[in-house]
């Protein structure tokens, strides 16, 4: 064939190619789907760890879980026996909240110590120590252990490449957070806590937890500014050395203060130039300076700040009398340790006691754990931070005597504390009921936005579904929304929005769960919250064998102050008169006495 004839055929071939129909395009559903990350199914049970291999394979690490098998579901003999004998959380709660006469007998015997040791070890063992994951690392890493700027997390985040926001269950898009707030969390009518919890408790909860819940606004919700990760009283002394120094008097170990109408109060920002969050227009001399920058928000928070300031300076006077050769620094540091001990004592024996509703009398005794394996170190978890948004406690308005204060009148009220005085506010807050936390629809509209932001934050943190946390803390997952809520109306609405009970989010699940009978909240809040709380309290260094001795607290006097601390002592040893003070509203059948009485000499 000649070269010329070949050249003439090329245009013809090109023309034929152009006239051919294009190859058929397969519809999207006919294409080979991308493999789903197998860990999105949460296949590993009983704290097994899911490790992905390749695109569609996984392996469960069942090491030391007590289970074996591909998904850690086959119990070992000892595990099977233990599970067979272990009562359910609901049965244990019933047992601990019924039969008062039986528990009065137990509380008077050595059995109380045995049960308390069992409670502390069983609860604390549910918290991983050292810490495991954080917002940036869903696997064991040195960064997760060493970088205390992160909150830790108990469960890794939902993998990024899952079919739905909560893994594989539920809808492709989560419900609008504002809609959830309005439908399920907004208060219709104030529901008081049936256990009798009061505002003195509610403000203590806020004041106490703000020493270790200090999310970094600059870094994001997975980071904290409270680098002590526990009860270090940073809300009294500041979370850094510069702030501490601004608040200290540098004389006899004391903190700065001002005297108004013969009473000790925190200094003004003029006297202690630290950052405090007050609205514009409030003069510096009207702003009180304390360890936590947000405590000017509520008079109840500044009430506790004032009480602990007075307590610190009172303890310093007692230590100075016992140790006249001690300098300012040693007096300050020892007083701080005593106040840490007093705080933990009050929290365990009165605060947690009130929350639990147990007839078993809880006991703060670090020596109970000296024979057990226990790590005296703590790391605050983002799940604990999420769980502790207890805004249903807040009432519709605030009463002091016969005077009612709206939120607009109460927030940032800088004169109420000095106008009424500590005693009158303690008495008023101790008599006003707080709201029930669980069960839903009990958050006042003034603070609803905080709950909505909590839901949004949990999505940014990619927290696993509520049922996964129930399994992680030894509870049976709920099978339906009706089982969760105990009623039909909310259950049907939740079903419509989420599509599947296994897609329910962590925080809404905690607040919407049906409460135990006559209780402040439901099973999950107790079973998940208690381990975090007790591990954080008993994991404090002062509870260790090296620290728990008289010399740490300046001798037997300081040691006894820790071991005998009560809420009533905190108030009545730092006021001129002794008001009614408790974490529980008074029994109307027993409370016929005056609102304020003289301090007891036994305090």
Curated annotation (Swiss-Prot):
Dual cyclooxygenase and peroxidase that plays an important role in the biosynthesis pathway of prostanoids, a class of C20 oxylipins mainly derived from arachidonate ((5Z,8Z,11Z,14Z)-eicosatetraenoate, AA, C20:4(n-6)), with a particular role in the inflammatory response. The cyclooxygenase activity oxygenates AA to the hydroperoxy endoperoxide prostaglandin G2 (PGG2), and the peroxidase activity reduces PGG2 to the hydroxy endoperoxide prostaglandin H2 (PGH2), the precursor of all 2-series prostaglandins and thromboxanes. It catalyses: (5Z,8Z,11Z,14Z)-eicosatetraenoate + AH2 + 2 O2 = prostaglandin H2 + A + H2O; (5Z,8Z,11Z,14Z)-eicosatetraenoate + 2 O2 = prostaglandin G2; prostaglandin G2 + AH2 = prostaglandin H2 + A + H2O; (9Z,12Z)-octadecadienoate + AH2 + O2 = (9R)-hydroxy-(10E,12Z)-octadecadienoate + A + H2O. GO terms for molecular function: heme binding; metal ion binding; oxidoreductase activity, acting on single donors with incorporation of molecular oxygen, incorporation of two atoms of oxygen; peroxidase activity; prostaglandin-endoperoxide synthase activity. Glycans are attached at residues 71, 107, 147. Residues 35-73 form the EGF-like domain. Homodimer. N-glycosylated. N-linked glycosylation is necessary for enzymatic activity. It comes from Canis lupus familiaris (Dog). The active site is at 210 (proton acceptor), 388 (for cyclooxygenase activity). Its main location: membrane. The cyclooxygenase activity is inhibited by nonsteroidal anti-inflammatory drugs (NSAIDs) including ibuprofen, flurbiprofen, ketoprofen, naproxen, flurbiprofen, anirolac, fenclofenac and diclofenac. Residues 1-27 form the signal peptide. Its cofactor is heme b. Coiled coil: none annotated. It is a peripheral membrane protein. Binds 1 heme b (iron(II)-protoporphyrin IX) group per subunit. CDD domains: EGF_CA, prostaglandin_endoperoxide_synthase. Brain cortex. Isoform 2 is expressed in the cerebral cortex and heart. This is Prostaglandin G/H synthase 1. InterPro entries: EGF-like_dom (IPR000742), Haem_peroxidase_animal (IPR019791), Haem_peroxidase_sf (IPR010255), Haem_peroxidase_sf_animal (IPR037120), Oxylipin_biosynth_metab (IPR050783). Pfam families: An_peroxidase.
